[in-house]
Amino acid sequence: MITIIGPTASGKTSFAAALSARIGAEIISADSRQVYRRMDIGTGKDLDDYVVNDKKIPYHLIDIAEPGTQYNLFQYQQDFHTVYDKLQSGNRPIVLCGGTGLYVEAVLKGYALSPVPQDPVLRESLEGKSLSELEKILVELKTRNHSVMHNKTDVDTTNRAIRAIEIETYQLSHPVGERQMPKVNSLIIGLDINRDERRRKITQRLKDRLANGMVEEVKSLLDSGIPAENLIYYGLEYKFVTQYIIGELSFDEMFAALEIAIHQFAKRQMTWFRGMERRGFQIHWLNTSLPMDEKIKFAESLLGNDNIIN
């Protein structure tokens, strides 16, 4: 398997699709928000990128959950292995592509996870606490658990932080069992984008998404009966656009806050990927500004050296 990672706006999908077209691979997404149906513009699905030379590249784990629900890491790990095992049995090359570092690391390392029920008493005790207060509690729990899960990338709202605390608290009294998920051997390619170029692309992409109907997309989700707090839970575009629609922010306030949040998110993504290197992953960094054919040649040279496709 080949894994392609990188921060938002680094061109992961187009590179993964072009590489998959060259080697006959199918793509498994590793994006914690693209799993949701009808959340297309805000999550940046860019499904047109999966068409290369008029050929549609098969992709998986996109549009598999209903908006308003809370898809989680445990579910992703199960769904990943269902698809992975099927593709392997058919001897299909696989490209794992996404910016959710926790999802990528969990499937490559084979983290032993279990479904964690909600704890109403704990949730009530955490109500009213600020995000910074919740983060301090989470850091302490992670230290006690020796946990690498729940990076700031994944807890950018109070609801997410409370859920992370709930999981870490559960793990303290329910140690992970002996059975591990199988580790997955993979060549990892990281897309490295210049900071200034990344910031420019993020800002332009945000303008494009707003011009192409992102506000209308969020309105339609609200009109379908999804509570505002459920959309705010998803963070970033869905958080700030929802706050704009319900009157908590002006358009200019929404744009400014969202732009800052996405820049911070991209920075945290890179922090996670650098942390993966410290935790023993070898990542082959590729300059995203290179022409696509040079990127493909880079990947093929690595495949020629390591021959890690399945």
Predicted regions and their residues:
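Phosphate/pyrophosphate-binding catalytic cores of soluble transferases and nucleic-acid-acting enzymes
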Residues: 1-310
